[in-house]
C-alpha cells in the first residue's frame, strides 16, 4: 500500500472591498479596455486598512477546515505560502496557528512568490508520505496591494489580495494514477532571472519597496516553463495532457494562461479561470481557484488536476493530483 496526500477540504476568503478597473482609471493613466485587453482582469479585491495577510489566511483556513469536517487541533502541520507576511518574523503560519487556537503540531512559511502554493503543496506531500504528518493545512495568502507603485500602470492594475486553503490527509491507496491524492510534483528555480520580478526594498534593507517587473521577459519564461513543468509532472505520474480534466493555473493574466494551455494542447474549456474576478493574487491564486472551481461545480471527485505556477526568483513548478 502507498500513502497519498488526499484533498479533504478547501476554502477561500476575499476581502470585502472590490476594486473594478474603472476605479483604477482615477488613480493611474489607464482604461478598463486597456486592462482587460492585456490581462483579462475586470476587478480585484483589496484588504481593508489594518487587515493583514494572516487575517485573510485564517479566514480561508477556517473555511477549509469546515469543508473537511475537522477542528484546528486535528491538524499536524500548517504551511502558509506568502510573500507578504505581516512581519519579517514571526512567520505568518505561527500567527495563523494562534488565530485558529491550534495547540499542537508545527507551522512554517514558504516563500516562492507566485509559485509559493505549489512549493507548499510539494512540502506537505513529502511530510505526509514520510509519515511526519497525517493532516496538513496548506494556505496561500497575499496582500499584494501594499507592494504596488501606483505610478506604474504596467503592474499596479494586475494584483489583488486574497487567501485560499486546502486540507491534505494521508490516506492508504493502491498507488495507481486512478487513486485520489497528489500523484507527482515538479519544482524548479533559477536565480539568474531574479531581476525580472522583484520588490526593490523591504525586509533587512530598512526601506519600503515596490514590485518591479519586466513583463515581456516574464511572459516568455512563463509560457515556456509552465508548459514544460506541467508535462514533466504528468510524465512522472505516467499520464499525458489528454488525461487532464482541469488545469488549475496560477492566475497571473489571461494571456499567460491561454498561451500555456495552447502549448500544452489543452482547450480553454478545461482551464479553471478566476483571474477576471481576483486579478493576480500571487501564492493565493491556485487555492482560490481550487475552492471556487469546486464551489462552481466544475471540479469533482475523481478529476485529474494539474496546478502550475511561476513567480519571482524565478521559481516555478507543478503538481498533479487526483481530486
UniProtKB/Swiss-Prot annotation:
Record keywords, A-Z: Acyltransferase, Cytoplasm, Fatty acid biosynthesis, Fatty acid metabolism, Lipid biosynthesis, Lipid metabolism, Multifunctional enzyme, Transferase
Reaction catalysis annotation: malonyl-[ACP] + acetyl-CoA + H(+) = 3-oxobutanoyl-[ACP] + CO2 + CoA
Record-linked InterPro entries: ACP_syn_III_C, ACP_syn_III_N, FabH, Thiolase-like
Major place of residence: cytoplasm
Compartments where located: Cytoplasm
Function: Catalyzes the condensation reaction of fatty acid synthesis by the addition to an acyl acceptor of two carbons from malonyl-ACP. Catalyzes the first condensation reaction which initiates fatty acid synthesis and may therefore play a role in governing the total rate of fatty acid production. Possesses both acetoacetyl-ACP synthase and acetyl transacylase activities. Its substrate specificity determines the biosynthesis of branched-chain and/or straight-chain of fatty acids.
Database matches in NCBIfam families: fabH (TIGR00747), PRK09352.1 (NF006829)
Similarity comment: Belongs to the thiolase-like superfamily. FabH family.
Name assigned to this protein: Beta-ketoacyl-[acyl-carrier-protein] synthase III
UniProt organism field: Cereibacter sphaeroides (strain ATCC 17023 / DSM 158 / JCM 6121 / CCUG 31486 / LMG 2827 / NBRC 12203 / NCIMB 8253 / ATH 2.4.1.) (Rhodobacter sphaeroides)
Gene symbol of the encoding locus: fabH
